[in-house]
């Protein structure tokens, strides 16, 4: 008998299944959980970690962090050499995108004190700066004009209510 786990997420993926994949990240710290909607990546040892503004490759955590079974979702070990890995179990499932549309509620975005950094249509999506409070690490952030060295993971295409939609690429563009 196989056991099945299901997840809901605040992250909305607006794409055909054939246009994206999920990247499995084995989370080293099995005592804390990661909110969905945060950018995650691999560390140099192959484990998952919160991404920062210097990472060129980043995935969006899809697994719901408020589910009663979140420890099962994020803390179960998985075998990265296995040819079959269920989406529902073992580590984090990061959305791996190449020009797909994602939507993340505004409450999950990093918003600096300046209104110039508020998400708006046409702004670039980056990762909260390292100087941001630790509680904001890995959150998506918006910038109007890419400065030299900035890594952009997409552009905001629309805002509906409190939900921010953007075209997402897991391989960032560095300016």
Residue ranges and their predicted role:
Residues 1-175:
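Surface-exposed, low-hydrophobicity beta-strand/loop segments enriched in small/polar/acidic residues
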């Amino acid at each position: 008998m196989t056991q099945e786990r299901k997840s809901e997420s605040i992250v909305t993926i607006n794409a055909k299944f054939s246009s994206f994949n999920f990247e499995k990240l084995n989370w080293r710290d099995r005592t804390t959980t990661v909110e969905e909607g945060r950018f995650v990546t691999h560390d140099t040892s192959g484990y998952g970690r919160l991404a920062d503004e210097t990472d060129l490759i980043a995935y969006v955590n899809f697994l719901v962090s408020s589910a009663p079974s979140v420890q099962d979702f994020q803390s179960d070990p998985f075998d990265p050499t296995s040819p079959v890995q269920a989406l529902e179990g073992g580590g984090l499932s990061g959305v791996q995108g190449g020009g797909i549309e994602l939507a993340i509620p505004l409450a999950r975005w990093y918003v600096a004190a300046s209104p110039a950094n508020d998400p708006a249509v046409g702004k670039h999506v980056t990762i909260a700066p390292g100087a941001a409070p630790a509680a904001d690490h890995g959150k998506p952030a918006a910038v109007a004009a890419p400065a030299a060295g900035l890594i952009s993971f997409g552009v905001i295409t629309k805002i509906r209510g409190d939900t921010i939609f953007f075209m997402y690429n897991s391989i960032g563009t560095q300016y």
